[in-house]
């Protein structure tokens, strides 16, 4: 029984992290240049920390890209930074505090860490003098996007989310526990993130993330942000990969039911990393929705 339980978790882990192994690299500080077709990077002081971001494009429509667990703008959104329309959009891909290049501080996971990320994200974009923004949120970044849209409705124009969930189930908890020990990950899954963070930081942060996300299971109905969904006012596109082994379809259906006026787009061959595996299709979908 133990073997049967561990194997699916390991498979899910590989599916989660495998898209990063060919794209992830250690972020390098890049010179700030004229915003346009060249991706630039910088840091800005927000809420007592220095948040790192990448920026590209010169369009009127500002878009913030929000990465997933242990992710960063550079590792999670390369195809979007490269290929989304630079004349129509200005793209900003951020590293949440404690992730990527937004260190120090080390990442921690108090119960309100998603709310903290949402405030950081909005305040970052305000510090960059954007009057209003749209959100692209993957996985944990999708949860952060939902909270930001609910709490700052006048600031968010539109939102695209995928791989997100508003609550935690027993099934989710089993998946989380299966990835706690990074020494049990495959080398292909571990090495790229180890190059980004170093082994000790990666191992500790992964354990802390599992504890942080698992604490929601102790709340009524496993609540992360389900109580905030009725407050979302912006047009919302939910994208779900029908072969996603990490986030079951019922999470997308729940969001569709509780986010007023939202739309659900299913990708039959999509998995958790659908925006990387099917980048061209995903980018077209995003551009059509945000126009």
UniProtKB/Swiss-Prot annotation:
GO terms for cellular component: mitochondrion. GO terms for molecular function: alpha-amino-acid esterase activity; serine hydrolase activity. The modification N6-succinyllysine is found at residues 74, 126, 184, 191, 260, 271. Mg(2+) binds at residue 221. Its main location: mitochondrion. Specific alpha-amino acid ester serine hydrolase that prefers small, hydrophobic, and aromatic side chains and does not have a stringent requirement for the leaving group other than preferring a primary alcohol. Has homocysteine-thiolactonase activity (in vitro) and may play a significant role in the detoxification of homocysteine thiolactone in vivo. Catalyzes the hydrolytic activation of amino acid ester prodrugs of nucleoside analogs such as valacyclovir and valganciclovir, converting them into their active forms (acyclovir and ganciclovir). Monomer. May also form homodimers. This is Serine hydrolase BPHL. It comes from Mus musculus (Mouse).
């Amino acid at each position: 029984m133990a073997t049967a339980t561990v194997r699916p978790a390991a498979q899910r882990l590989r599916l989660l992290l495998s898209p990063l192994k060919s794209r992830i690299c250690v972020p390098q500080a890049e010179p700030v240049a004229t915003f346009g077709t060249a991706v630039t990077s910088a840091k800005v002081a927000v809420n007592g920390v220095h948040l790192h971001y990448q920026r590209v494009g010169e369009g009127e429509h500002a878009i913030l890209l929000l990465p997933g667990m242990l992710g960063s703008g550079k590792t999670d959104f390369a195809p979007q930074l490269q290929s989304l329309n630079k004349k129509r959009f200005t793209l900003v891909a951020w590293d949440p505090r404690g992730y990527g290049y937004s260190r120090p501080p080390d990442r921690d996971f108090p119960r309100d860490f998603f709310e903290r990320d949402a405030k950081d994200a909005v305040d970052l974009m305000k510090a960059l003098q954007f009057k209003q923004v749209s959100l692209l949120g993957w996985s944990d970044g999708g949860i952060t996007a939902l909270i930001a849209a609910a709490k700052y409705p006048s600031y968010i124009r539109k939102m695209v989310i995928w791989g997100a969930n508003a609550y935690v189930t027993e099934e989710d908890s089993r998946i989380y526990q299966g990835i706690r020990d990074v020494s049990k990950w495959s080398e292909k899954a571990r090495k790229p993130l180890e190059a980004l963070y170093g082994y000790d930081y990666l191992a500790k942060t992964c354990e802390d993330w599992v504890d942080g996300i698992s604490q929601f299971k102790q709340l009524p109905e496993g609540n992360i942000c389900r109580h905030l969904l009725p407050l979302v006012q912006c047009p919302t596109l939910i994208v779900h990969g029908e072969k996603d082994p990490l986030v079951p379809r019922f999470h997308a259906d729940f969001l569709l039911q509780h986010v007023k006026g939202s739309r659900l787009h299913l990708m039959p061959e999509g998995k958790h990393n659908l925006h990387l595996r099917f980048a061209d299709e995903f980018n077209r979908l995003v551009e059509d929705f945000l126009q």
